[in-house]
């Protein structure tokens, strides 16, 4: 039972780290990256479809993305979806390819984005700590039901704390890398 609690806590913490990584990937840096457009959905025959299912997103150069749309009738819809996203991008179509130049980030915008990234990291840390709290309360309830000893509780809490520290350290490393990426000119 205790191993189940530890394994559950570890897998939930890993999901928290992955979620934080995903949220940070959405924050636009000065460099072109295909994952920048992952959140964009296009109206495709009446249903909202992810952009990567209606076209191929690639990097043209360090500041330009290219979207090769599979169905040429979808070019207008894809352009509209990119423009209406909150990324502040202006796509230009050239045949079946849509080019998306990324404007350079101003110093002020970089600082705002760093605040956003730090907030995402803090949300990730909070989620990891909540998992720790849940695991510790589960173990204590086992002790109250006399299904484990006080020593088992202490050992499990120590193990869960080690998981917590390791996952928070991972989130901090992701944050540091993202901040460095944002401050690159």
Swiss-Prot record:
InterPro entries for this protein: Ribosome_recyc_fac (IPR002661), Ribosome_recyc_fac_dom (IPR023584), RRF_sf (IPR036191)
GO CC terms in record: cytosol
Subcellular location: Cytoplasm
Coiled coil (UniProt feature): none
An annotated Gene Ontology molecular function: ribosomal large subunit binding
Superkingdom: Bacteria
Alphabetic keyword roster: Cytoplasm, Protein biosynthesis
Presence of keyword Nucleotide-binding: no
Biological processes, Gene Ontology terms: cytoplasmic translational termination
Pfam families registered for this protein in UniProt: RRF
Family annotation (SUPFAM superfamilies): Ribosome recycling factor, RRF (SSF55194)
Protein biosynthesis recorded as keyword: yes
Family per similarity comment: Belongs to the RRF family.
Protein's job: Responsible for the release of ribosomes from messenger RNA at the termination of protein biosynthesis. May increase the efficiency of translation by recycling ribosomes from one round of translation to another.
Protein name: Ribosome-recycling factor
Gene responsible for this protein: frr
